[in-house]
Design a protein with these regions (language model features):
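Short, low-complexity, intrinsically disordered N-terminal peptides in bacterial proteins
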Residues: 1-6, 164-168
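Extended accessory regions or peripheral subdomains of proteins
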Residues: 2-27
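Short hydrophobic/aromatic beta-strand micro-patches
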Residues: 11, 63-65, 104
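Short, structured patches in soluble enzyme cores that scaffold and shape functional sites
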Residues: 12-14, 66, 132
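Residue-level signal for inorganic ion chemistry
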Residues: 15, 40, 130
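Short, surface-exposed acidic-centric catalytic microdomains
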Residues: 25-69
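Flexible, gly/pro- and Lys/Arg-enriched active-site loops
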Residues: 48-57, 68-168
Length: 168
């Protein structure tokens, strides 16, 4: 890997229309980006955040190596969301597709448009479980904790049910 090649983790989520189809379309579109060696986690089914009255989500994590700068990757992810019908009406509301950059190498970014690592990742089993599945050696760039510990901590603190793995 060259110094311009950055390992990234991207979370996908959908709970409107045909969520499995939206995840597939998002993966297909991500494959067209400068995102090499792309791997996909299992698909998980999770309850909406904060017990909101909306359909359950399907979630998945993808990882790969990119040459894009973090802001460029964010713009590409937002363009994919828009093409797939994402409408931003309500925070944590239902959506056709949600695409979040979880990590960008071991970098930390805190800009008005992008926060990396994703600031809510440690509270979300639907991110932690697939991250452990496809990158079991991953280490949080701020805390230094491995993904295994982050997931153990979530399990010990959260009263939310674990997401259900739908497909390997």
């Amino acid at each position: 890997m060259t110094s311009n090649e950055i390992p990234v983790h991207i979370a996908l989520g959908s709970n409107l229309g045909n969520p499995e189809n939206f995840l597939e379309k998002a993966r297909e579109t991500l494959r067209k980006l400068p995102l090499e060696k792309m791997k996909c986690s299992s698909i998980l089914k999770s309850s909406p955040l904060l017990g909101m009255a909306q359909p359950d989500y399907l979630n998945q994590l993808v990882c790969g190596i990119t040459l894009l700068k973090a802001e460029e990757l964010l713009m590409e992810c937002q363009a994919i969301e828009k093409r797939l019908g994402r409408i931003r009406e309500q925070r944590w509301g239902p959506r056709t597709i949600d695409i979040d950059i979880i990590s960008y190498g071991q970098q930390t970014i805190d800009s008005s448009s992008l926060k990396i690592p994703h600031p809510e990742m440690e509270k979300r089993a639907f991110v932690l479980m697939p991250l452990q599945e496809i990158s079991p050696q991953w280490t949080h760039p701020v805390s230094g904790h491995r993904i295994e510990k982050l997931l153990e901590d979530w399990k010990s603190k959260s009263s939310e049910p674990l997401p259900v793995i739908l497909s390997p």
